Regions:
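C-terminal segment of classical bacterial N-terminal signal peptides
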Residues: 6-14
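A ligand-binding cleft/hinge motif common to bilobed small-molecule-binding domains
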Residues: 88-102, 171, 176, 204-222, ...
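Short, solvent-exposed loop/beta-turn-alpha elements that line the ligand-binding surface or hinge
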Residues: 115-131, 230-231, 301-307, 329
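Secondary-structure end/capping motifs
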Residues: 248-324
Length: 335
C-alpha cells in the first residue's frame, strides 16, 4: 500500500498473514492504557508499523494509531496542539523547535542509531557499495557536474527540513573543504517530491531518506556524500518525540510505549525478522521489491536515549547559526 504524502488520516495496514506474532505473549491481558497517536514521515514509519502488526504495543496494553505527515513542521505543530501524542523525527529538529518556540519537548524512545565506525566509514569511498551507509544521502542526476561537496557552491538543494541536521551536515562538509556556502540555497521537499524536482531542474541535488534514496540510485541518481557523517555524533539518529504536557497527561501509556519500542527495536535487529520487516517497508512506502531488497537496514537502538547522545546538538546548531538561544536539555529525556 503506497502512502500519499500530506496530512493523512489514521493509517491501517493489514498485519502479516502469519498467525505467530513476534510479540505474542502467554501472559494475561495487560491493563488497557488507551491510545497514542503517532505521527511520522513515511521513511521512518515502517519500524513502528511492524511493531503494530506484530502485536508489540498490544502486549503492553496500548493501541497506537499512526498518522503520516509530510513535514517536520506539521509533526511538531501537531505535538504542540495535542493532535499527535508522538512524532518520529531527529533530536536535532526537536532542539531546533525548542529553541525557536516556547515548547518543552521530550524524547521518549529511540529509533535507529549510528556508531562511530559507521560515521567514519561514510566519509570514505565508495559511497555506495551496493547499499546506503547511512539513512540519508546527497544525490544528483547521473550527468550532473556536481562531483564533490565543493561543487555545491551556488546550488539549490532539496532537504526534508529547513535548518535540519542534513542541511547542517552539508554546510559542515562544505566548510571542511573550504567551499563557500553563502549562496547555496536549501528548499524543503518531501522524499516523494525530491526525484521529480531534480529531474525538472528545480533543484541541483536532493537529500532523501531510504528507501526513497535507494530507489533514486537504482533509477540512475549518483551519490555525493552523507550529511550525517559530518553533523552527527555516535548515538540516536531518529527518535520518538513528545511534549512535556502530553507526557504528564499520559505517563503510564508513555512508559509502556517506551518498553514496547525497545522490544520492537531488539526484534528488528534479529535476522529472523528481516523478511517481514522488508515487506512492511514496501507496504508503507510503496517502494518496489527491487528497492527494498537493496536496503541496508539500520541498527535499532535497544537502550533508552542518554544525555550524552544529544548534548552536542545545541552547540552544533549554534555554530551553524541555526539557533541563537540556550536550550535546556536537562528535562528532554523521558525516564
Amino acid at each position: 500500500m503506497a502512502i500519499l504524502l500530506g496530512v493523512a488520516p489514521f493509517l491501517t495496514i493489514p498485519a502479516q498473514a502469519d498467525s505467530t506474532l513476534a510479540c505474542s505473549s502467554n501472559e494475561k491481558l495487560p491493563q488497557d492504557l488507551g491510545t497514542l497517536v503517532l505521527a511520522s514521515i513515511p521513511a521512518n514509519l515502517p519500524s513502528a508499523q511492524w511493531g503494530i502488526d506484530q502485536g508489540c504495543f498490544q502486549k503492553y496494553g496500548l493501541t497506537v494509531k499512526p498518522v503520516v505527515v509530510a513535514s517536520t513542521q506539521i509533526g511538531m505543530a501537531g505535538l504542540v496542539s495535542g493532535s499527535y501524542d508522538l512524532f518520529m523525527n531527529t533530536p536535532s529538529n526537536l532542539v531546533l523547535f525548542m529553541a525557536n518556540s516556547n515548547f518543552d519537548g521530550v524524547i521518549v524512545a529511540p529509533r535507529h542509531t549510528y556508531t562511530a565506525a559507521e560515521i567514519s566509514r561514510a566519509q570514505q569511498d565508495p559511497l555506495y557499495p551496493g547499499a546506503l551507509l547511512l539513512q540519508t544521502i546527497v544525490l544528483v542526476k547521473k550527468d550532473s557536474s556536481i562531483k564533490s561537496w565543493k561543487d555545491l557552491e551556488k546550488r539549490k538543494i532539496g532537504v526534508k527540513s529547513f535548518h535540519g541536521s542534513d542541511q547542517g551536515g552539508i554546510l559542515m562538509a562544505m566548510r571542511q573543504v573550504g567551499a563557500d556556502s553563502s549562496k547555496t540555497e536549501f528548499l524543503a521537499l518531501t522524499d516523494a517530491q525530491m526525484g521529480p524536482a531534480m529531474e525538472r531542474g528545480d533543484v541541483d541535488a536532493v537529500v532523501p531518506s531510504d528507501p526513497f534514496a535507494t530507489q533514486l540510485i537504482l533509477g540512475g541518481a549518483r551519490p555525493v556524500g552523507y550529511p550525517q557523517a559530518y553533523f552527527a555524533k555516535p548515538g540516536v539518529a531518529v527518535a520518538y518525540l513528545s511534549s512535556a504536557k502530553t507526557i504528564n497527561q499520559k505517563t503510564s501509556a508513555m512508559r509502556a510505549f517506551q518498553k514496547a519500542i525497545l522490544e520492537i527495536n531488539h526484534l528488528l535487529n534479529q535476522p529472523t525478522n528481516d523478511s517481514s520487516y522488508r515487506k512492511t517497508i514496501a507496504s508503507v512506502t510503496g517502494s518496489s521489491d527491487a528497492t527494498v531488497a537493496k536496503l541496508h537496514l539500520p541498527t535499532m537502538s535497544e537502550k533508552n536515549v542518554s544525555f550524552s547522545e544529544i548534548a552536542y546538538i545545541p552547540n552544533r546548531l549554534k555554530s551553524l547559526k541555526f539557533i541563537t538561544t540556550r536550550v535546556n536539555l536537562s528535562t528532554a529525556l523521558f525516564k
